[in-house]
UniProtKB/Swiss-Prot annotation:
Cytoplasmic face residues: 99-176
Family classification: Belongs to the FAM174 family.
Transmembrane domains' residue ranges: 78-98
GO cellular component: membrane
Signal peptide range in chain numbering: 1-31
Keywords: Glycoprotein, Membrane, Signal, Transmembrane, Transmembrane helix
Topology with respect to the bilayer: Single-pass type I membrane protein
Extracellular side: 32-77
Source organism of this protein record: Xenopus laevis
Subcellular location per the Swiss-Prot or TrEMBL entry: Membrane
Residues the record marks as carrying a glycan: N52
Pfam families: DUF1180 (PF06679)
Protein's UniProt name: Membrane protein FAM174
Length: 176
């Protein structure tokens, strides 16, 4: 097993290559039968002529070469191995695509989370009030806001800090 539970392509390819090599090696010990002689002239016609009996009995014209190659089993086996290897590669990539798609759905469950917060600009909600106060302004660095605002506000659990645009003033809004 490879990283993230995937079977590496090298190990699958290596196994299929070993299978292909073993199929060729195992064919080396097998004997291939010679093509069977077939009469050039049908036996019924040869008996009627009588003088051409030497060609029917085994002369140079007596055998017709077979249309099938003696390497047919080896070729078929190589083709089967090639098809199986191609199918294994296709299945591997399909499973990999499905797994990555499932992982992407899990990460997108709550929306886009990998954006850079420094580049994000938040605008205040439209309100009927004529206040310039915003509850949060992402354009100001956190280092300016954090210590100064915390030191200026009383330490009660129910308060909200609002920041006036363009300034570093902190105003505490009390929530009761």
């Amino acid at each position: 097993m490879g990283v993230d539970g995937y079977v590496s392509l090298c190990s699958v390819g290596g196994m299929l290559l070993a299978l292909l090599a073993s199929s060729f090696i195992s064919d080396g010990g097998c004997s291939v039968d010679a093509p069977t002689p077939s009469p050039a002239i049908p036996t019924g016609l040869a008996s009627k002529k009588g003088s051409n009996s030497s060609t029917v009995d085994g002369g140079p014209l007596a055998t017709v070469p077979s249309a099938t190659s003696p390497n047919t089993p080896r070729t078929q086996r190589a083709l089967v191995v090639l098809v199986l290897f191609s199918a294994a590669v296709v299945i591997y990539f399909v499973i990999r695509a499905v797994r990555t798609r499932i992982k992407n759905k899990k990460t997108r469950k709550y929306g886009v989370l990998d954006t850079n917060l420094g580049n994000m600009e938040l605008t205040p909600l439209e309100q009927d009030d004529d206040d310039d106060d915003t509850l949060f302004d992402s354009n100001q660095p956190r280092s300016q806001l954090s210590l100064a605002c915390i030191l200026q506000t009383p330490q009660f659990p129910a308060h909200v800090i609002s920041i006036r645009k363009g300034t570093s003033q902190c105003n505490a809004l009390w929530v009761m």
